[in-house]
Curated annotation (Swiss-Prot):
It comes from the Bacteria. It comes from Kineococcus radiotolerans (strain ATCC BAA-149 / DSM 14245 / SRS30216). Residues 9-19 have a biased composition (Acidic residues). This is Small ribosomal subunit protein uS9. GO terms for cellular component: cytoplasm; small ribosomal subunit. Transmembrane segments: none annotated. HAMAP family: Ribosomal_uS9_B. Belongs to the universal ribosomal protein uS9 family. The gene is rpsI. One of its GO terms (biological process) is translation. Residues 20-36 have a biased composition (Polar residues). Keywords: Ribonucleoprotein, Ribosomal protein. Gene3D superfamilies: 3.30.230.10. GO terms for molecular function: RNA binding; structural constituent of ribosome.
Length: 167
């Protein structure tokens, strides 16, 4: 009657098989040791308004690449440039990582906020003990929940009502 195999039977067959071992070791590779946080690359996602930024940081010289463009070209506004660089300034890691980011949606302010959150989350993932307290205190790990309020029927905008005439 058992024409079909259950998921549990398949899992048992795989775990009993000699093909699948728990760990893989190579004689040529060095054993992994936890340690220097500057060596590990990190990645994270940041969101703000309608913008989404996928961020990857790797050890380097502080070069920013956003959608294939430099930081100065992508964010010509100096306020936005300072905004996205704040997580590095707070953690005193300015110039020690290269940032590669893909951003879509939203406007320039939302994209800058999304990029800042993504960079902060990536720094947090690289070295939790060293970076998290500074980033948390500065408020960089908190996603800004504010979004555009929808327009309601019978109103001109989200809250603006047509002019009221008493008589």
């Amino acid at each position: 009657m058992s024409e079909y195999t259950t998921e549990a039977d398949t899992v048992e067959d795989i775990t009993e098989s000699d093909e699948f071992t728990g760990t893989y070791t190579s004689e040529s590779s060095t054993p992994a040791t936890g340690g220097n946080s500057i060596i590990a690359p990190g990645g994270a996602t940041g969101r703000r308004k309608e913008a989404v930024a996928r961020v990857r940081i790797v050890p380097g010289t502080g070069k920013w690449t956003i959608n294939g463009r430099e930081l100065d070209n992508y964010f010509p506004n100096k306020v936005h440039q300072q905004l996205v660089n704040e997580p590095f300034r707070v953690t005193a890691l300015e110039g020690s990582f290269d940032v590669i980011a893909r951003i879509h949606g939203g406007g320039s302010s939302g994209q800058a906020g999304a990029l800042r959150l993504g960079v902060a989350r990536a720094l947090n993932a690289i070295d939790l003990e060293a970076n998290r307290p500074q980033l948390k205190k500065a408020g960089f790990l908190t996603r800004d929940p504010r979004a555009t309020e929808r327009k309601k029927a019978g109103l001109k905008k989200a809250r603006k009502a047509p002019q009221f005439s008493k008589r």
